[in-house]
Amino acid sequence: MFLGLRTVIYHAPDLAKAKAWYTAAFGVAPYFDEPFYVGFQVGGFELGLDPDVSGVTVGNNAVAYWGVADIERAHAHLLAHGARESQPVKDVGGDIRVATVVDPFGNVVGLIQNPHFTAEA
C-alpha cells in the first residue's frame, strides 16, 4: 500500500528566488517549472516549491531530513549558500548524525547521515 515518502514541498512566496537558491544549493535543475510549482528530482525523491503561502506558517511544519553521505560537508555547503543554522551537526547515537538549517525563505531543511539506512528505489 504505502511506498514511502516521495515529495517534500517547501513554501516559498518568491518562487524565482527559491528556484535559483535550490538549483545552486542542491546542484540540480528543476524537472518541472511552472509559475504555480517548481519540482526538483533529488536522489529519487521530489523537492517541490510552492509559492502559495496562504494559510501556511512557513517553517512551522514537519521537518524532512535529506540523506547525505558527509553531513559536515553538506551542512557547510548550505550555510555557504545563505542558509541559517538552526541546529548544528550532532550525533544522536548509533553513528547517526543530524543537523538543520533554515533556508532564505523560512523553511527548515533537515540533514541526516545514517549508515544503517538505505532508501529503496
Name the predicted role of every residue range.
Residues 1-19, 44-46, 62-64, 115-121:
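N-terminal beta-strand motif that seeds the catalytic metal site of vicinal oxygen chelate
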Residues 3, 35, 94-96:
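Loop/turn position at the start of each blade in beta-propeller repeats
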Residues 17-18, 71-75:
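Short, conserved charged micro-motifs
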Residues 18-23, 78, 106:
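Conserved active-site tyrosine of GNAT-family acetyltransferases
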Residues 27-32, 85-89:
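Short secondary-structure junctions
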Residues 38, 62-64, 95-99:
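Short beta-strand micro-motifs in enzyme catalytic cores
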Residues 75, 81-121:
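Vicinal oxygen chelate
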